[in-house]
Amino acid sequence: MEKRIANIIYSSRWLMFPVYIGLAFGFVLLTVKFFQQIICVIPEILTMSESGLVLIVLSLIDIALVGGLLVMVMFSGYENFIAKMETTENKKRLSWMGTMDVNSIKNKVASSIVAISSVHLLRLFMDADKISDNKIMWCVVIHLTFVLSAFGMAYIDKMSKKHYS
């Protein structure tokens, strides 16, 4: 009976599979939004202000960072919780695949969130004259919370590795 329960619990990891498929679909949607922004800016490029162009580029960077975060979570999550990804050619396999444990994934996700928040904050600062001081203050507070959380998680990870080494 105990072995059967263990097998059921172990097999339940496959319930994560639709979640990763959903993330892949989210990545497709991000890609569509990325190209939509590029297509929309093309007719206006010659009349657009430099700061307007910088805001568009920051938006594209933001989408790229979120996309990278999605890919990292999909690939490493699949490999950590479901099964090893087999590619047709080993040379196509990304070098970091199979090397990230849950703690390193958490640290990379936290770093990515800080980077995404930084880009968002920079976009706000570029339009600071149109945004209330209160909103900017709260965005800075939230960003600092992300930064402190990332440092805290990295510190805890470092201490736990030192303690268990």
Curated annotation (Swiss-Prot):
Transmembrane segments: 15-35, 53-73, 136-156
Transmembrane listed as a keyword: yes
Swiss-Prot/TrEMBL keywords: Cell membrane, Membrane, Plasmid, Transmembrane, Transmembrane helix
GO cellular component: plasma membrane
Signal peptide start and end residues: none
Keyword Electron transport attached: no
Matches recorded under Pfam families: UPF0114
Membrane topology qualifier: Multi-pass membrane protein
Subcellular locations according to the entry: Cell membrane
Classification via InterPro entries: UPF0114 (IPR005134), UPF0114_bac (IPR020761)
The family this protein is said to belong to: Belongs to the UPF0114 family.
Name listed for the protein in its UniProt record: UPF0114 protein in repA1-repA2 intergenic region
Source organism phylogeny: Bacteria, Pseudomonadati, Pseudomonadota, Gammaproteobacteria, Enterobacterales
